[in-house]
Structure formats: structure tokens, C-alpha cells
Amino acid sequence: MSSGGLLLLLGLLTLWEVLTPISSKDRPKFCELPADTGPCKAIFQAFYYHPVHRTCLKFIYGGCEGNANNFKTIDECKRTCAA
């Protein structure tokens, strides 16, 4: 195979890796946890991964405790958990 063909193949494989969604076995376990507002009474907009809908959704976070399925931005949620 020519060097041009190898570069094309490498580029296609790289693109495939970037565009392939995270599989459920590679997703962190905390992404399966339910949204948890925690016991505090603040009102912060946050995002959590919803495993049934396979997307990130908004929820209100109280500001303390809760769990790890809690992200400040939807992009952070998607990068970490979304398939």
C-alpha cells in the first residue's frame, strides 16, 4: 500500500474513533446513577446522564452531596457519559 493510502486509512480510522459513541461497557458506572439533588436547598442548574433515554438532561442541584452523575454543563455530561 502506498504512503498516501496508509495516511488515508489512518485518517479514516481516527475519524471513526472520534465519531464512534461511548459503549455502555466503557461508560463510567456513575453515569447509571439517578439524578440526586442532595439535601441542601440551593438552586443550581446541573445536568445528569439518563441511561434509559441515553442523553443528558437538566435537573436542579441543591449544592451539596448528591452523586457523581452531576455536571455543570451539558457538554461535560455528553463527553463523560453520552453514547
From Swiss-Prot:
CDD domains: Kunitz_textilinin-like. Expressed by the venom gland. This is Kunitz-type serine protease inhibitor superbin-2. It is found in: Secreted. One of its GO terms (molecular function) is serine-type endopeptidase inhibitor activity. Keywords: Disulfide bond, Protease inhibitor, Secreted, Serine protease inhibitor, Signal. It comes from the Eukaryota. Belongs to the venom Kunitz-type family. It comes from Austrelaps superbus (Lowland copperhead snake). The record marks 41-42 as: Reactive bond for trypsin. Disulfide bonds join 31-81, 40-64, 56-77. GO terms for cellular component: extracellular space. The keyword Membrane does not apply. PANTHER family: BPTI_KUNITZ INHIBITOR DOMAIN-CONTAINING PROTEIN, KUNITZ-TYPE PROTEASE INHIBITOR-RELATED. Pfam families: Kunitz_BPTI (PF00014). Residues 1-24 form the signal peptide. Serine protease inhibitor. The keyword Glycosyltransferase does not apply. Residues 31-81 form the BPTI/Kunitz inhibitor domain.
